């Protein structure tokens, strides 16, 4: 009889990697938030358009999950990135922390489904799309209660597409590039990203 029990051993690098991703993206988010604010006059014409810009905020969880592939890595990275952004004066304050949790859980769930083993492009695209869906629910309730049904559908579609493309596809491209350059300390190996 085989033991299929998931055994997890954390090394220092398994914690340092999500933290480094988080700090980098916390700073990036501050800059991206400024760009997002500059685009506000254009997106205010039809608010659901803002959803198409959201996938970038999902990157810490997707990257940490792909690189470390251990329970909690995506959550640690996304929540810490949100904390850094909020601490540096991000415009959304404490709501950023709630978003951090909401944005990390779909990646954690997707990795759990594959027992934290091989995480390929399909997994990260699905995780990105699910993250977009989850974040759309949170933002619809918290920030956009005025949306009519049609606006809500458009917003959800934009969030899901953005999560899959700006989140999932970009994360996959970054990890693939890092693996090809042999800059990752562990999984995925270059053969995992072909």
Region locations from a protein language model:
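Interfacial aromatic-anchored transmembrane helix boundaries in multi-pass membrane proteins
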Residues: 81-111, 142-143
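Transmembrane alpha-helical segments of multi-pass membrane transport proteins and ion-pumping complexes
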Residues: 22-30, 34, 58, 66, ...
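Hydrophobic alpha-helical transmembrane segments in multi-pass integral membrane proteins
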Residues: 136-146
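Single conserved hydrophobic/aromatic residue that forms the stacking wall/gate
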Residues: 185-194
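Membrane-helix interface "capping/anchor" motifs
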Residues: 66-75, 114-122
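Hydrophobic alpha-helical transmembrane segments
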Residues: 15-19, 55, 59, 75-76, ...
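Internal alpha-helical transmembrane segments of multi-pass membrane proteins
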Residues: 92-97, 112-133
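Hydrophobic transmembrane alpha-helices
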Residues: 2-64
């Amino acid at each position: 009889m085989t033991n299929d029990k998931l055994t997890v051993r954390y090394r220092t690098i398994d914690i340092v990697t999500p933290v480094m991703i988080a700090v980098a993206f916390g700073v990036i988010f501050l800059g991206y938030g400024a760009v997002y604010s500059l685009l506000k006059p254009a997106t205010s014409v039809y608010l659901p358009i803002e959803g198409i810009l959201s996938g970038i905020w999902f990157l810490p969880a997707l990257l940490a999950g792909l690189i470390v592939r251990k329970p909690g890595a995506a959550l640690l990275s996304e929540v810490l990135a949100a904390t850094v952004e909020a601490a540096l004066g991000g415009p959304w304050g404490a709501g950023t922390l709630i978003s951090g949790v909401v944005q990390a859980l779909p990646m954690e769930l997707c990795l759990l489904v594959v027992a934290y083993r091989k995480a390929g492009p399909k997994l990260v695209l699905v995780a990105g799309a699910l993250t977009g869906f989850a974040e759309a629910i949170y933002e619809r309730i918290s920030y956009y209660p005025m949306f009519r049904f049609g606006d809500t559908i458009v917003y959800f579609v934009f969030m899901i597409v953005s999560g899959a493309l700006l989140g999932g596809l970009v994360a996959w491209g970054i990890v693939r590039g890092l693996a090809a350059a042999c800059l990752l300390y562990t999984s995925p190996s270059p053969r995992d990203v072909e």
